[in-house]
Amino acid sequence: MRLAVVRHAESVENADKYNGFYQDPRPWTGAAAHALSRDVIGLTARGFRQTAWLGETLPQVVGDGPAVFVSQYRRARDTAELAMPGITAEVTGLLNEQHYADATYMTMRELFETFPDGADDRRHRKHLWTPPGKGGESLAVEVHGRVTAFLALLAPGAVEAGRSAVAFTHHTTILGLRAVLEQRPVTEVVEESRARKLPNAAVLVYRVAAGRYELEQVIEPPA
């Protein structure tokens, strides 16, 4: 049995985040910015091409009829639907991107000026930083807890039945998943990501045996 963890294909935010999404001052409320990120942001033309590549690649990894899970965000749902047509994915908030709450799409300058109390954590301990506002999540606590819950739910339905699974999710959520799946400190995974960020549409393939996950390979889309 294998678990394929997939970062969503390239979104319009990934391609052009500093030319429109991050404005100073931010033109939206925190709630509106979060809704924009969750419900509106779709894929670029390159992202659509990446989903075609995923459609060819994933069956070679997980075979036919895997269990498919996807976050509630549009860019992840679009990736799953285009990459695996004909398979109904289970949409789950457990795979959502880190919730940045009132900090969503704020520049660093505006963030530190508006919410100075959390500035040190954001600068030096980002994995511990809890974004201000309702629903704000830290990587080390809330995101880590969510992905742990996802894997606990996955175990009886797929792992124990020997059925492969695919999880379409997001950059920061994948950091949490890697920490749990590979039994590594969050700080180590974060530092590794700073050196080289996992590209959009990349696939982490884990072999599952006796309830343990072993990273088998990382497959990246064509440049």
Where are the model-predicted features located?
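Active-site-adjacent alpha-helix immediately C-terminal to a catalytic or transition-state-stabilizing loop
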Residues: 77, 85, 148-214
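An N-terminal RHG(E/S)-centered segment typical of histidine phosphatases
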Residues: 1-65, 210-223
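Phosphate-coordination/substrate-recognition cap region in phosphate-metabolizing enzymes
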Residues: 3-4, 11-13, 45-120, 187, ...
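Generic structural signal for well-ordered alpha-helical scaffold segments
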Residues: 52-59, 144-156
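Short glycine/proline- and acidic residue-enriched helix-loop micro-motifs
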Residues: 33-42, 119-141
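Short coil/turn segments at beta-strand junctions that form active-site/ligand-binding loops
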Residues: 1, 64-66, 159-165
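A polyampholytic, Gly/Pro-enriched intrinsically disordered region
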Residues: 108-123, 210-223
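Short, solvent-exposed loop/turn segments at secondary-structure junctions
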Residues: 9-12, 73-76, 96-97, 171-174, ...
